[in-house]
């Protein structure tokens, strides 16, 4: 009994000590509306079952092509790509768009809701033209992603989870985007911008404001994800076909 109490006391002390350094892992979904507060939908004037939404004729053709990728009778497997298509058409996913996806794929609406509320890539509230997603998990944090986040907030005059008054930029924090070797990095719409400094992200924002699309990828001079100090192997052009093969072969 005493041992358990001691453990609980120690755990409480560690929590208090480190709590100010630990980010709330659930808040990403809360901030970008991917799940909304407690993943609950509440009708609003701009987001309710009567909000106008229908796929364009071109997108109906795309849906037909998507569904053909899956076995007959398994349209439900296409929920993710068709939700993505709806979001790309509309900019975000109102409940009416989810209902349309369910109708087109002939699945219960709940099967669509559970997907749309699970993945943070689906936006359940409007976002700006440029959706800035800053990775702040461990590798990026160790590479000073906080300075990138602060630079964006200062440059745009908004906080995490907010959109600029001109509807041009929305800023959120996200969990790992899978480009840890190029930390710190951000995703803006579909593009990755890596090996960033505060100055880099300010320049990227300036280009976007000017109507340009900055070149994606590392900003440090690296081609891809090779070692920052230069190649340590495969430093010469590859040999041609047959190199090193025994003469008898």
From Swiss-Prot:
Chief site of localization: mitochondrion
Subcellular location: Mitochondrion inner membrane
Class in the EC hierarchy, top level: translocase
GO molecular function annotation: 2 iron, 2 sulfur cluster binding; metal ion binding; NADH dehydrogenase (ubiquinone) activity
Residue positions, PTM Phosphotyrosine: 193
Keywords attached to this entry: 2Fe-2S, Acetylation, Electron transport, Iron, Iron-sulfur, Membrane, Metal-binding, Mitochondrion, Mitochondrion inner membrane, NAD, Oxidoreductase, Phosphoprotein, Respiratory chain, Transit peptide, Translocase, Transport, Ubiquinone
Subunit record text: Core subunit of respiratory chain NADH dehydrogenase (Complex I) which is composed of 45 different subunits. This is a component of the flavoprotein-sulfur (FP) fragment of the enzyme.
Protein name as annotated: NADH dehydrogenase [ubiquinone] flavoprotein 2, mitochondrial
Record organism: Gorilla gorilla gorilla (Western lowland gorilla)
Gene it is expressed from: NDUFV2
């Amino acid at each position: 009994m005493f041992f358990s109490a001691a453990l609980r006391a120690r755990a409480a002390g560690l929590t208090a000590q480190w709590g100010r350094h630990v980010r709330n892992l659930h808040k990403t979904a809360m901030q970008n509306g991917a799940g909304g507060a407690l993943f609950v939908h509440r009708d609003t004037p701009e987001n309710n079952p009567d909000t106008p939404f229908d796929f364009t004729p071109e997108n109906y053709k795309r849906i037909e092509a998507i569904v053909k990728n899956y076995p007959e009778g398994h349209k439900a497997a296409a929920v993710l790509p068709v939700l993505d298509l709806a979001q790309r058409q509309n900019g975000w996913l109102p409940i009416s768009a989810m209902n349309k996806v369910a109708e087109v794929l002939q699945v219960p609406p709940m099967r669509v809701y559970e997907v749309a509320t699970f993945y943070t890539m689906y936006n359940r509230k409007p976002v700006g033209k440029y959706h800035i997603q800053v990775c702040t998990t461990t590798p990026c944090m160790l590479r000073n992603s906080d300075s990138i986040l602060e630079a964006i907030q200062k440059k745009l005059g908004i906080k995490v989870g907010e959109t600029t008054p001109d509807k041009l930029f929305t800023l959120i924090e996200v969990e790992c985007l899978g480009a840890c070797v190029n930390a710190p990095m951000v995703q803006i719409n579909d593009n990755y911008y890596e090996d960033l400094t505060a100055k880099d992200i300010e320049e990227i924002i300036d280009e976007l404001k000017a109507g340009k699309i900055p070149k994606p990828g590392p900003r440090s001079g690296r081609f891809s994800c090779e070692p920052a100090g230069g190649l340590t192997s495969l430093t010469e052009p590859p040999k041609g076909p047959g190199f090193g093969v025994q003469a008898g072969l």
